[in-house]
Amino acid sequence: MEFCHTETLQVVRLSQNATIPARGSPGAAGLDLCSAYDCVIPSHCSRVVFTDLLIKPPSGCYGRIAPRSGLAVKHFIDVGAGVIDEDYRGNVGVVLFNFGNSDFEVKKGDRIAQLICERISCPAVQEVNCLDNTDRGDSGFGSTGSGACGGRDTAWYIS
C-alpha cells in the first residue's frame, strides 16, 4: 500500500529528549507521540506528559491526540482531551489517565499517544429562535442504538 503525502506536519524539537512523530506502519492514520521524560502516573491519577515538541498541523487541519490501544488494553492507560489547534505553538503535552490499580511508569522515548491530523470546519455562529424538526428530535444517550444487537442491549467487557 502506497500513500501520497502532499501536506507537511511541521515539528520543532525543544530538547534532545524529543522524538519526531512517526507512523507505526505505512497505512497508520496516527503518528506516534513519545514521552520526553521519565515519570510515574500513580494508580487512579492523571498526569500531563510532555513531548518537548512544537507541532504545526497542515493548513485547514488540527491535531487530535488519541489513545494507543495497547496501552489501554494492557495497562488501563487512556488519553484525555487533546487538541492541537492550527495556531498553537506550545510544548505538546499528553494527558494520561491511569485507571489501573498499579502505578504506571513512563520512560523517556515511550510511545504514549498518537497524533491524527483531521480536517476542520470553522463555521460562523448564528443565534436563531428555533431549529428545524427531525424524526429523532431530542432523543439522545443511546436512543438510536436500542435493540441493535439482536433485540437486546449488549456491552462487551475486557477482564
Curated annotation (Swiss-Prot):
Specify the enzyme's EC class, one word. Answer: hydrolase
* UniProt keyword list: Hydrolase, Magnesium, Metal-binding, Nucleotide metabolism
> Which E.C. number(s) belong to this protein?
3.6.1.23
Instruction: List GO molecular-function terms, semicolon-separated.
Output: dUTP diphosphatase activity; magnesium ion binding
Q: Name the Pfam families on file.
A: dUTPase (PF00692)
Q: Which GO terms describe its biological process?
A: dUMP biosynthetic process; dUTP catabolic process
Q: Which reaction does it catalyse?
A: dUTP + H2O = dUMP + diphosphate + H(+)
Q: Does the keyword Hydrolase apply?
A: yes
The cofactor named in the record is: Mg(2+)
The job of this chain, per UniProt, is described as: This enzyme is involved in nucleotide metabolism: it produces dUMP, the immediate precursor of thymidine nucleotides and it decreases the intracellular concentration of dUTP so that uracil cannot be incorporated into DNA.
Q: Per the similarity annotation, which family is this?
A: Belongs to the dUTPase family.
- What is the official name of this protein in its record? Deoxyuridine 5'-triphosphate nucleotidohydrolase
Task: Look up and give the organism this protein is from.
Answer: Orf virus (strain NZ2) (OV NZ-2)
Q: From the UniProt record, report the name of the gene that encodes this protein.
A: DUT
